């Protein structure tokens, strides 16, 4: 009998955190955060990081594990996350993967191959120089001709991954996206119960806008000032996160605060749209509409599925 794993995904601001903690309490679970921003130390407000109070003594993994100046790949997440899963299982608890970063979720629940071994340092340096001279969008557009799926899935500001996708195509002649497809892709050692929270788009967008306002009220600007004092700059992977790069532009007097806030809201809404597109392509996902089901009904369904299957 395969070990069960619960996955709770969904777009930003849909309400994953509170529900996941209730589930962990009911199912004797521990949570592995699948969020590409919550991995960073000292970046709490802009990442909507779960607080100690919100955790309610539920163990959380993959939060505050790297400093903002460090590079961190999906392969890194997979290596550390797999160890966390084994630790949770050893305690006879249920591993629960919770978050909105689909690549992170797949790295732990799919038969994912990382093409990290072959490299072309000269070509990579060339692409880096192109991005420096012309901006991230320039190299991102280069993807469009050779790998539509990666072009759609990888954000222009994720320069490292864009460059890796271009590099893989140059080395192998195969699109980066083609390395993780096929009949065996969803085969794992685990019995994966995968749920995605959704709600009406306008309602979700309103929640996103409100959350951004609360982040500003709670001190996002001060958080970014402190990060700048520590020497962290907009060229770092971590500081390209939505909420951070816009406030850094404001602090550098490139845009007004109102412009920064509006850009954060727009960027967050666009991100939520991309997240939903990602989840809809995954045949394992069971979608739970929060406009149709109450939180209690969602809890009951998931608990019933896990305990009776």
Swiss-Prot record:
Residues 35-38 are annotated as: Interaction with substrate tRNA. One of its GO terms (biological process) is tRNA modification. InterPro entries: Dimethylallyltransferase (IPR039657), IPT (IPR018022), P-loop_NTPase (IPR027417). The keyword ATP-binding applies. Its cofactor is Mg(2+). Its EC number is 2.5.1.75. Catalyzes the transfer of a dimethylallyl group onto the adenine at position 37 in tRNAs that read codons beginning with uridine, leading to the formation of N6-(dimethylallyl)adenosine (i(6)A). Monomer. This is tRNA dimethylallyltransferase. It comes from Clostridium botulinum (strain Alaska E43 / Type E3). The lineage of its organism: Bacteria, Bacillati, Bacillota, Clostridia, Eubacteriales.
């Amino acid at each position: 009998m395969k070990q069960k794993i619960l996955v709770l995904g969904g777009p930003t601001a849909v309400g994953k955190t509170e529900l996941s903690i209730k589930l962990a309490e009911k199912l004797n679970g521990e949570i592995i955060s699948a969020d590409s921003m919550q991995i960073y130390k000292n970046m709490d407000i802009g990442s909507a990081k779960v607080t100690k109070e919100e955790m309610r003594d539920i163990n959380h993994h993959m939060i505050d594990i790297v400093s903002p100046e460090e590079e961190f790949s999906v392969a890194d997440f997979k290596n550390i996350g797999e160890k966390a899963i084994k630790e949770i299982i050893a305690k006879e608890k249920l591993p629960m993967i919770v978050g909105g970063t689909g690549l992170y979720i797949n790295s732990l629940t799919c038969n994912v191959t990382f093409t990290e071994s072959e490299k072309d340092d000269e070509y990579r340096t060339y692409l880096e120089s192109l991005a420096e001279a012309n901006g991230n969008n320039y190299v991102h557009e280069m993807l469009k001709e050779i790998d539509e799926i990666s072009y759609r899935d990888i954000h222009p500001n994720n320069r490292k991954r864009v460059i890796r996708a271009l590099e893989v195509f140059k080395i192998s002649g195969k699109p980066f996206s083609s390395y993780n497809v096929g009949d065996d892709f969803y085969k794992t050692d685990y019995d994966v119960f995968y749920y995605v929270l959704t709600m009406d788009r306008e309602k979700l967008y309103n929640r996103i806008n409100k959350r951004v306002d609360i982040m500003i009220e709670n001190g996002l600007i001060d958080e970014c000032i402190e990060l700048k004092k520590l020497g962290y700059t907009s060229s770092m992977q971590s500081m390209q996160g939505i909420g951070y790069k816009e406030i850094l532009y404001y602090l550098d007097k490139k845009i007004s605060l109102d412009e920064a806030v509006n850009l954060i809201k727009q960027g967050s809404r666009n991100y939520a749209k991309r997240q939903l597109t990602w989840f809809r392509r995954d045949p394992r996902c069971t979608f739970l509409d929060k406009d149709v089901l109450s939180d209690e009904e969602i809890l009951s369904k998931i608990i019933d599925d896990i305990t009776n299957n």
